[in-house]
Amino acid sequence: MAEKKYGHFDDDNREYVITDPQTPWPWINYLGNEDFFSLISNTAGGYSFYKDAKFRRITRYRYNGVPMDNGGRYFYIKDGDTVWNPGWKPCKTPLDSYECRHGMNYTRITGSKNGVEASVLFFVPLHTWAEVQKMTLKNQSLETKTLKVFSFAEWCLWNAATDMENFQRNFSTGEVEVEGSTIYHKTEYRERRNHYAFYTVNTEIQGYDTDRESFIGLYNEFSEPQAVTEGKPRNSFAHGWSPIASQYIEVTLQPGESRDLIFLLGYVENEQDKKFVAKKVINKEKAHLLIQQFNTTEKVDAAFAELNQYWDNLLNIFTIKSGNDKLDRMVNIWNQYQCMITFCMSRSASFFESGIGRGMGFRDSNQDLVGFVHQIPTRARQRIIDIASTQFPDGGCYHQYQPLTKRGNNDIGGGFNDDPCWLIFGTVAYIKETGDFSILSDQVPFDNQPGSEVSLFEHLKISMNHVINNLGPHKLSLIGRADWNDCLNLNCFSWDPNESFQTTENKGEGSKAESLMIAGLFVVTGKDYVALCKQLAKEAANSSEGTIAGLAENDYLAEANRMQQAVDQMSEAVKQHGWDGEWFLRAYDFFGNKIGSDENEEGKIFIESQGWCTMAGIGLEDGLCDKALDSAKERLECEHGMVLNNPAYTTYHVEMGEISSYPEGYKENAGIFCHNNPWVIIGETVAGRGNDAWNHYTKILPSYVEEKYQTLHKVEPYVNCQMVAGKDAARPGEGKNSWLTGTAAWMWYTVSEFILGIKPDYEGLLIDPCLPSTAKEYEVVRKFRGGEYHIVIKNPDGKEKGVSRITVDGKLISGTIVPCSPGKHEVHVEM
């Protein structure tokens, strides 16, 4: 397929502008950032939900449907005999003009046809359980236009899983109510449910429909609803089957005249004793109040301005001026924005994740935290407590939990032995950003069981102990069900195609299969834990009570010493048993055989262990890190990034599990897993190799990819995706699984702290850049603990690593940590 452009960045407005509705894949955006969320494509496809995309799905969407992107919030405009949509779909009537602007938690879709322009602004106002759809109709012709406007939303019957399965029940449960211009979805609003949804418009309507088949017509499609083509609503009332909400509005516009219509899709929960105002009559008081908040253009415009100000504040916490537009737009806008979306969604709801099978991941959410903690530290704090509450007393944890209930997901269970380490990673990042040590004293339960509470610090301690207590024959970390690579299942031995690799019971007996990835992760987080304990010793010594989280200075020093010994022992085990001669092994399987070794015919080298062991600095002084990084560059790098393993597996290996079940070049079998490319990039900065770090970074940076490969890349060019097809694939460079990926947080963490080198630390901001030799100067504004730091970094000699001097407000400081203090500060750094 030939390359073409479908859009471009608009940095001034913080938008990506799509100019062709027929993108290679639906290019989406997210609305909402608290409780009410919507996914919206460039043609207005998608759906809305409250908190949990599985249990509180409000509108229906058809994944993997034909045609693609099937279902959404649609507006049909009938102008004479012509029926069209502002977003092109679902009618696909050729438009005279089309534009979609995806911004920060809003999308504006504009289309025109035969002298009429329709522009729809979609957003979820702050602190609001509703999606606003502000439609502006404008007559650009020289004649009077009489238009027939039909709105459309299809209700989901709350549980998105059973909505697609249990039709013998579903076709009898749907219930609606119509009051003026508002259509209420009250399915199952009886004894068990206290919530309902509604769809309204701020004008008198001339008709409506609430039954899908009545509106569309039997055997018709969304592209040709019978009520629209005939220009006559049916005023249908749904009793079971498939309830919808469609308002019919007649609009007359003189030449040059425009008119706003405000549609509102909302969600309401009532207290149990206030569910009804009369028998079977739902209490609509909260809905009425919500409708009144957004029933005029002025109110909607004010709410939209408030949303934009919110994003101004968030994105001004860290800004860069480098002279490189592609870098600046990702750092200042899109990378931070994607990090906020992954905070809200984890891996639950995208156009690749159905919102049904996955909730919030223990590992995922801890990693995501480093991408947003500087923006919303209070919410980061709560997220840490929620995550820790799903831990078990032995330090293990549920792999996932549901956002609505915050309870662990029993279907997935636990046993992923990297998970506990990530709690250290996330908590340390929070404390370094905020200086809030009090979180460690918070009492947090195990498995959300009342009465089991211990301090968060105790949770961190048992997380470390979980690794120490689960070592294999080479004194390396046991892998358990899997490590970060969920598809490396060394104890599964699955021949049954009907079972899941992740959830089937391990068949390997005993504790044998070991992970070098977890070993490297343990050394990194173990060092963080040791440093935290030493800092807590200082804090306890200076505390009026002499303790922090119930422990005194000597307790923390003893714990630091204990864990340092464990870290040193793991490092030695890696050097002794995990070094293959030119790179780090990936693992030992159940039988004690090497994985990721030059001895193997396939899968000789893996990216994960090269990343984590070099991030940990294991063997740095002995040259092991340089050798491993050189090997990764030589054997894993290709045009589109670094593949996960090489060579790809061409046959199924039962002793390795799911990784060898994928076709070559896709997903975990030698695909470019963008998530782990930053691990090698950070490893490059640890080794002081700024040029290599920059080269790896820009290969997967969306703004660089967007410039060359919009068609080939397929998915959204303004955010990272999880996977890009590797060099062994049928279509190298094709992206999949966009938006909800740990790549977002890792790219942010990598560029902000390791390339640009602005690192939050306990005592202040640690300045330690690692740059390409072409980078001679850049400026960063960083807001941090009540201070604002204007940091100018100059690199006249093109050094890759090493700070020679730092001045703060004109005064030379000792070392590379800029101390915390309120107010504005000028920081000048020379390399």
Regions from the PLM with identified roles:
Residues 127-130, 136-148, 193-194, 202-212, ...:
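Beta-rich accessory regions
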Residues 350-365, 408-417, 501-519, 593-616, ...:
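Solvent-exposed loop and edge beta-strand segments that line ligand/cofactor-binding
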Residues 319-333, 378, 382, 387-396, ...:
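Active-site acid/base region of carbohydrate-active enzymes
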